[in-house]
Amino acid sequence: MAICQFFLQGRCRFGDRCWNEHPGARGAGGGRQQPQQQPSGNNRRGWNTTSQRYSNVIQPSSFSKSTPWGGSRDQEKPYFSSFDSGASTNRKEGFGLSENPFASLSPDEQKDEKKLLEGIVKDMEVWESSGQWMFSVYSPVKKKPNISGFTDISPEELRLEYHNFLTSNNLQSYLNSVQRLINQWRNRVNELKSLNISTKVALLSDVKDGVNQAAPAFGFGSSQAATFMSPGFPVNNSSSDNAQNFSFKTNSGFAAASSGSPAGFGSSPAFGAAASTSSGISTSAPAFGFGKPEVTSAASFSFKSPAASSFGSPGFSGLPASLATGPVRAPVAPAFGGGSSVAGFGSPGSHSHTAFSKPSSDTFGNSSISTSLSASSSIIATDNVLFTPRDKLTVEELEQFQSKKFTLGKIPLKPPPLELLNV
C-alpha cells in the first residue's frame, strides 16, 4: 500500500478512511482496515464520515441503475407511473404482467393490470363519444403492439375506393362494405367497454405479447391478411358486397385508366382499375410530344376530354369523367404550344396560340417552330384569351381598369383590354 503523502504533510483530510497508508496511525494500516467515525467538523470542505463516496466498497453511480423516470421507492417494482400520459415504461416485466395470465399476481401487478384495463375502457368511451375517425388502430401504451380488432384506413383510401366504385356504377357494394366495417368497429368498441373474464385475458395477452398485425392494405403488391376479422378496407371485386371485397392490389405504380382512355405511365392498372387500351408512353401516341402523334391520340398532360386525358382521368386519380375534366379545363393558352387537336401542357382551343408557337397538331410544334419564335409573331399571336375587348366590359369594369388602383369589392374578374396596358 502506498504511503499517503498528504498524511506525511499533516493535511490528509480523509483520516482513517484514506485509501493510502498512514504510518504510525493506529497500527499503520491505513483508513480501510479500521474505519472509525470522526467528528464531522474535522474536514475543511464539508466531507463527513457518513459520505459513501470514499467508503470501503466503490459505490456505483446512481445513474447506472435503470430507475424509472417517474421515481419509485421500490426499484424492482413494475409500474405504470406514466400510463395516463401514454408513455409507460417498464424495466423488469412486460407492463407489470406475469407471464402466465392465470397465475396468481402480486398486489402491485394486479393494481397495474386494473389501471391498464380502466384506461382502455375510458379510451373506448372517449373514442365513441368524441366522433373521432373510427377506422384507426389503437394501443393503450406507447410504442407497443396495437390491440387486435381495429382496421387502419385513411380518408384518402376511402375516397379513392369511392371513385373507383363510382366509375363502375356499383356504389351499393361500396356502401355495404363501409357499413360492415362500421359495425365491426362498434362491436369491438362495445367488447372493450364491457370487459368479461375471457376478454380481459385476451386483452392482457395482446398488450403483453402483441399479436401478429396484418400488413397495411394499401400497399404496392401487398395482399391483405385479416386480423381479428378486420379486412383492412379493400375494394376490388365489385360483384361482391362484403367487407372482404375491399383491396388495393396493384400491378403497376403509376398506371391506371378505364377502358378506352390512355394511361399515364403504362397500361397495367394501378389501383385495381380496369386495364387501359392505350398507353401514354407508346409508339402510336408519344407521351411528351417527341414525335408526331396522330390526331386522335392524347397528349399525356392534356385536360381536354375524358378520353384524351391522362392526369385527371378516371383511371389515375379515381375520378369519374365528369369530375376529371370540369374543374381543370380553363380557357387559357398552352404554355409550350398547342394546336387545334392536341395540347402540350394546357387546355387547347380551336384558336389558341402562344408566344412560342403557331397552330400545329404536334405537342411542341413541328416545322412551324422555325417561324414561331419571332418577336413579331409573339405580339400578333395574342388573342381574346389574354385580353378583353372594350365592348365586352361593363362600365364599372372599364372604370376600374382606367383608375389608378382597384376598389375593394369591385375588382374585375376579366382580363383588361390591350389598349389599357402600358408596357
UniProtKB/Swiss-Prot annotation:
- Renumbered to this chain, region (Interaction with HIV-1 Vpr) spans 94-170
Region annotation (Disordered) maps to: 24-85
| Superkingdom | Eukaryota
Q: Where is this region: Interaction with GLE1?
A: 365-423
Which residues form the C3H1-type zinc fingers?
Answer: 1-25
Listed Pfam families: zf-CCCH_4 (PF18044)
Keywords for this protein:
Glycoprotein, Membrane, Metal-binding, mRNA transport, Nuclear pore complex, Nucleus, Phosphoprotein, Protein transport, Repeat, Translocation, Transport, Zinc, Zinc-finger
**What tissue specificity is annotated for this entry?**
Ubiquitously expressed.
CC annotations in GO: cytosol; nuclear envelope; nuclear membrane; nuclear pore; nucleoplasm; nucleus
Which Cys pairs does UniProt list as disulfide-bonded? none
State a single Gene Ontology molecular function. nuclear export signal receptor activity
Q: How is it modified after translation?
A: O-glycosylated.
Q: Name one GO biological process term.
A: mRNA transport
What is the recorded membrane topology of this protein? Peripheral membrane protein
Q: Where in the cell is it found?
A: Nucleus, Nuclear pore complex; Nucleus membrane
Positions of post-translational Phosphoserine modification: 106
Renumbered ranges of FG repeats: 14-15, 95-96, 218-219, 220-221, 265-266, 271-272, 288-289, 290-291, 311-312, 336-337, 345-346, 364-365
> Keyword Oxidoreductase on this protein?
no
Which ranges are annotated Polar residues under compositional bias? 40-69
Please quote what the entry notes about the protein's domains. The FG repeats are interaction sites for karyopherins (importins, exportins) and form probably an affinity gradient, guiding the transport proteins unidirectionally with their cargo through the NPC.
The UniProt function text for this chain reads: Required for the export of mRNAs containing poly(A) tails from the nucleus into the cytoplasm.
Subunit composition and interactions? Probable component of the nuclear pore complex (NPC). Interacts with nuclear export protein NXF1. Interacts with GLE1. Able to form a heterotrimer with NUP155 and GLE1 in vitro. Interacts with XPO1. (Microbial infection) Interacts with the HIV-1 virus proteins Rev and Vpr. The interaction with HIV-1 Rev, a protein that mediates nuclear export of unspliced viral RNAs, suggests that its function may be bypassed by the HIV-1 virus.
Name used for this protein in its record: Nucleoporin NUP42
The species is Homo sapiens (Human)
